[in-house]
Amino acid sequence: MAEIINGKEIAESILNNIKKEVENFDVKPTLAVIIVGCDPASKVYVKNKIKKSEFLGFNSILKELPEDIQKEELLDVIKNLNNDKNVNGILLQLPLPKGLDEKDFLDEISPIKDVDGFTTYNSGKLFKGEKPYSIACTPKGIIKLLETKNINLEGKVAVVVGRSNIVGKPVAICYCKKMQPLFRRIPKQKTYLKF
């Protein structure tokens, strides 16, 4: 029997618990968000991230950069945030404008400050079954929803739709030891993955 999970209620509970924890910190955490260009969807995501971080009691820094920024300039912004001892987390909003390849920038973020878990270090730790500093938020949210509802995937067959580095792969990796292996054809690839 299918059950609809109210993610908003669970998220609100988690946020309130985090807010209480942050109130007991000696120093307020600081999140730096970098957005390049003026993609409307990215602007909405960034606005919501800043709003949530401030609700939690975090300081936030928003770096709004022009679409025509040069590679070296963006690398300098990341380097400065890495070196800023007051900044605890860095988030580079994706997608980047045409002409800027995210691969050139994500690994420049310190793994300790990598809020999204997108650096090779953090995603590599996850892939190896080790504990990364951070896991991408959507897979982490999915896992938290399942855990909150006491949904045990051990020994079950589960289909992970998608294979992106942001959602599909991390979800599959997080649960691959608990799920029965499943062969799935990847559209447009003529390949099969075993999860």
Language-model regions, residue ranges each:
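Anion-binding alpha/beta catalytic cores of soluble intermediary-metabolism enzymes, centered on
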Residues: 91-153, 157, 171
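Conserved active-site and cofactor/substrate-binding residues in soluble primary-metabolism enzymes
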Residues: 5, 9, 13, 44, ...
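Non-catalytic terminal and connector segments of soluble metabolic enzymes
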Residues: 55, 82, 109-112
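Short beta-strand segments enriched in small/hydrophobic residues
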Residues: 28-38
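Glycine-rich phosphate/diphosphate-binding loop of Rossmann-like nucleotide-binding domains
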Residues: 36-50, 133-195
